[in-house]
Amino acid sequence: MKEHLTIDKKHKLVYCAIEKIGCTFWKRVFQIISGFKNVTDPFEIQAIRAYEGYLTAKGLPFDQIHFILKQSKSFIFVREPYERLLSGYVDKLFAPNAAYWAFIGTFITQNFRQNATEQNKKCGHDITFAEFVQYFIHSQHNNLRRDAHFVPNFEHCRPCEIDYDYIGKLETFEEDTLFLLTELQLDDKVKFTNFQSETERDAITDAADYVYSMRRAITKCMTMHEALFRAYRKLQIRGIISKHVPYPFTRDSQRDITIDEYKQELLAAHAQSGTSESRKANRKEALLEAYSTLPDDLLQQLRAEVKIDANLFDYEELPDVIRTAKEYKPSFKYFDVLM
């Protein structure tokens, strides 16, 4: 837990970071208030540069952590468990991510896939959501290959042991963030031009930066065409690019495209994608498609794993949208690149 506690002694703040719940954003806020970055807008800092310039509790003894918590305002953000699990899968295994393919993907193909090919076992680049859920449940029961992007919210931040002053939710992230910045008297130090549009542009930039930063490792397992298409599909799953805006490249036109050209095409696709309200349907459809692939027994096992998070943070153990997902018949398939 210690490494998740981000501390700012000057402002007497403690933030417990939970992966897949806006933690990259809040780490950039802490870079600003610590003076590490001389900007006021967190979105001016590249997401891939958000992992330095602030203090964590990792090397601190528990008595000192206890003292800091007593002197500070503390907060966490949580997220609906089924949506968070899918987000972790999309970001770390479905989208191009050679590091997670090597560490988690290969483990999954070797342990949860019948008749896996040697390429599957070597690369781990084509994991299905059902295979991922099998791995997640197994890792929780056996403490093998567990990863912070997937383990439940409560395991990160021990909310039964630490009485956090504020608990925000990703479902109301903008509203809760602006409230917190005002409440903590940080609104003069941290400012935005347009929170929502900057969030979406940030996601586009990060998707491009990440796939190009790992290009050499990724192309050992798939072509760059396939990798860039998956990054595009990830943005569609997130509701940033409409499902109605077709992928702008062919295999031939894309062969030597630069990162700047790719970003410009992503931004152009986003500009053609309509309102955020219309794009929200993408997220629900992708959720239904993913969970429709789980057999009933696996879904019930998963329900047991998310039960504590659901009860602690006022979510449903098995929402109707998840329980009835197997009845869903998609007209547009977000995960068809794995077929």
Put a short name on every predicted segment.
Residues M1-M339:
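Membrane-interface amphipathic segments in extracytoplasmic regions
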